[in-house]
Amino acid sequence: MRMYVKVMAAVIACILLSGEALSAFATTPATENLSWFKKKKKKPEEKEEKSKSDYEKLVEDSKTTKGMFAVHQKKNDYYFEIPTSLLGRDLLVVNKLQRVPTELNDAGVNRGVNYENQMVCMEWDKATGKLMLRQQRPLPLAPQTDAIFRSVKDNFISPLIAAFKIEAVNADSTALVIKVNDIYDGTETSINNVFTNINLGTSAIKNLSRILSIKSFSNNVVATSELTTRVTEGTTTVYVTVEVSSSILLLPEKPMMGRFDNQKVGYFTNPLLSFSDAQQRTDKTQYITRWRMEPKPEDREAYLKGQMVEPAKPIVFYIDNSTPYQWRSYIKKGIEDWQIAFEKAGFKNAIIAKEITDSMHVDMDDVNYSVLTYAASEKKNAMGPSLLDPRSGEILEADIMWWHNVLSMVREWITVQTGTVCPEARNVQLPDALMGDAIRFVACHEVGHSLGLRHNMMGSWAFPTDSLRSEAFTSRMNSTASSIMDYARFNYIAQPGDGVKVLSPHIGPYDMFAIEYGYRWYGKSTPEEEKDILFDFLSKHTDRLYKYSEAQDVRDAVDPRAQNEDLGDDPVRSSLLGIENLKRIVPQILQWTTTGEKGQTYEEASRLYYAVINQWNNYLYHVLANIGGIYIENTIVGDGVKTYTFVEKEKQQASLKFLMDEVLTYPKWLFDTEVGQYTYLLRNTPIGKQENAPTQILKNAQAYILWDLLGNTRLMRMIENESVNGKKAFTVVELMDGLHKNIFGVTERGGIPNVMERSLQKNFLDALLTAAAEPEAVKINKKIANEHFLLDHATPFCSCYAAEQRALRQEERMGAPRVLNFYGSPLNRISDAISVKRGELLRIKKLLQNRLGTSDTAARYHYEDMILRINTALGIK
C-alpha cells in the first residue's frame, strides 16, 4: 500500500503540467546555410556510390509508408527518410499518454494527457556524417536591421540534444535516412522523457520496452511505444508500463501573425523578450493563444464589409467513441455553443463537433485531430489544454480530457445548489436531461480553455445578487454569470417561489466579447497595425459585463469580486440566501437519498451531507475575502478609474458579523442533525475511506477560517488601509476586538464554556500563537496546507485551474500574475499585525487568570492550559 501511495503521489502533479499552455519558444535563426543545395552537382565519388548502394539495400526488404517522412521498417528496426527540404524547418515534438496502468489512472493521469512538448529543427553535419537535432529555445524578438540583432543571435543559442548516424542517402541526395529505434524504445530520452515528466524520476527498462508502430501522415509522423520502468522503495518494487505516442509535427513555414495580449481580456499568452536599438529598456511581447481563424481568400472583401462568412479552416472537435451514448449530444451542444461567439466575430460554422464512428476515415493517431477523450477514472475533473505553435501562439490542436467521475461532482452541485427550487434534483439518480444540461456547460467551459481563454472569476460579480432571483432577468441573460469561464455553477441564490427557470451557466456577454477580441480578422500584416483597432474595440466594452479578473488563491483572495464558486455582487447577501436554501435541504437528506433498494447503506446520505457542508464552507470564504479586501481594476492612463480601492468599512464589518454568526457560533442547523445520527462524513484518503464526525469537520472549518482571517498578508492589507483611509478603514484592532467578544464572550460573562466553545477558544488562541511566533507559523502553515477536510474535498473541477495557477507563477510560460505585496520579513518585524496579536494574547491571559476560580473542572483545566500556552509562546516564566 505504501508503494502504491508513493507512485500515486509522484504522478499526480503531472496533470498540472498537461493543462499548461506550451512553453514559449521562438525560432533560432538557421545556423546551417543550405544554399549549397543549389550548386551544380559534382561527379559522384566512390563513397557516394556506396551510400546509394546502402540506400538500396536498406529499402529493398523494408515495409515502407509514405508521408512527411518515409518510414522504413526492417524487422524490428525503424528508419526515417528525411527530405533535405525539411532541414532547418521548425518541428514540434508532441508526447501523449495512450494507455496507463492503475497507479496512474487513480492519480488522474490518463489516456490523452500531453506530458511533454518541445520545438526542434534538424541540421546535416557533413563533417561528421551525422544528422543533428537542435532544441529551439525562446529567442527574443529583434529587427534584423538593428545592430543588436547580432547580439541576440550570439547570446541565445539553442542546444543540440541528439545526433543520428546517417545510414544512407537516396539516389538524388534529396533525403537522408536515420535509424530511430533509440529515441522511441526508451534508450534515449532527448525527445521523449515520459517517466521524468510524470514525476517518477526513473528510466525505461530496455528489455521491457518496445516500439509498437510508427505511422507517417502528410505533416507529421507518430511513433507509439510501450515503455516500462521500475519504482523501488525499500524491498518493494512496482513495475509501471505506459503506452505513449510521440509525434513530430511540421510547423507552418510562415508563422501565423500574432495578436497582442491585453490585461482587460483573459487569454493564455506566449511571452517573448523583445530587443531593439531604439530601446532604453527591454520589453516583453505577449501574443495571445488562438486558432488560425481567417476568411477564405474569395470571402475577405465581404467579411471586411461586415458580412458573416465561413472560415477557411473551421475548428473541429471529435468526441471519443468511449463516451457514453447518452452524453454525446450534450457534449456536442456544449462544444458548438461557442458558435454564437464566433458569429459575433463574423464567422459562421466556425466550430463543429463530430462523433467518432467506425465508418469514419479518421486516424486519431494523426496529431492534427482535436479529440475529447473520455477516461474511465475515479478522478472528478475535466480539462481543456491546447497544442501551440510557440512562435506565434497559434493553437494547432486541442485535447479535452474528460474524467468519468466528474459526473459525481456535477450531480452534487445540482442537488445542493438547486434542490430547493428544482424537484427533479432531489434524487440519487438524476434525469438524463438534468445531468445533460450540466455536462453541456462543463464541456463548454473546457472548450473555452481550448480556444485560448483563461478563467474569468469576475463573471459572476457582473450579475447583481437580487437579479438572480428574478425570472425575467435570468431568462433574458440565460446564465448565472456573464462568462462561462468563471467558476459560477448553478443558481443557489434563487429561493422557492421566485419562479426562476434558468439555473445553470451558459455562454455570456464577456465570452462573446473575448472571442471577438481574439478572433475577429482585420486583414493587417503586423500586430502593430492592429493595436489602435483593438484599443477602440476595448474602449467600447467598459460595462461590468465585460470585466475580467484572473483566478485567486481561495484562502487569501484579495479582490472579493473575483472568486471561485460564487454568485452575485454581494458576498454576504448571496451567502445568506445560499444558507437559507441549505437549511431547507438538511432535514431532507435522508429522504432524498433513500432509493428503496434492499440493504441500502447511508453512504449516499453521507455524500450529500458532506456536499452541503462543503457548500456552506464555500460561502464562508466568499465573505471572508471582504475583510482586508481590495478592488483591483485593469486600468489605463486617462480612464479616470482607480487601480486599487479598499473594500468599504461597512462591508468588512458586516462580513465579520456574518462569520461570527455562521461559523464562529455553533451552527446547530448544520451539525445537530438527524442524518448525523446515522452516518458520519465519509472522506477518501490515500490509505482508504475515513469516517469523520460532523463536529470534527466543524472544528477543522473554524480553525482554517481563523488561520486565514488572521494571516499576516490579510492584516497587513488592513494596516495599509488604515494608513491610507484613517478612521474610514476597518482596522486590525477592531477586527480583534470583535473576535474576542464573540469567542470569549461566555468567559467574559462568567459563564462556563461548553466543549465546542472551548475548542473554538483554543482554535483562536492557536491562530494567534503560531502567528506571534513567526518562524513557527510558517512551518505550521505549510504543514496544515493539505489538511483541510473541506477545501481538499472541494478541489475545483477543471485541471486548467491548477495548471493556470502553476503557469502564472512561471513568467516564461504565461506571463506574471498581479501580486500585491504587503508582506516580507523586515515588514513583519515592524508590523502592527504581530503587535496586535500579542496584545490580544495578553488580554486573553488576563481574562483567564481572573476566571481560574471557576467551579467547573473542565473549564479550569482549559484556562490553565491556555495560560501555559501563552506563557510558553511569549517566553513568560
Predicted features and spans:
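Conserved catalytic/binding loops enriched for acidic/polar residues
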Residues: S460-K877
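Soluble non-cytosolic domains of exported or imported proteins
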Residues: E81, V113, T282, N321, ...
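Bacterial N-terminal signal peptides that target proteins for export
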Residues: M1-A9
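Auxiliary tRNA-acceptor-end handling modules of aminoacyl-tRNA synthetases
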Residues: P29-Y79, P83-T323, A341, A350, ...
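C-terminal segment of classical bacterial N-terminal signal peptides
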Residues: I15-A24
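Sec-exported extracytoplasmic/periplasmic mature domains
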Residues: E336-F347, G448-H449, L453, F490, ...
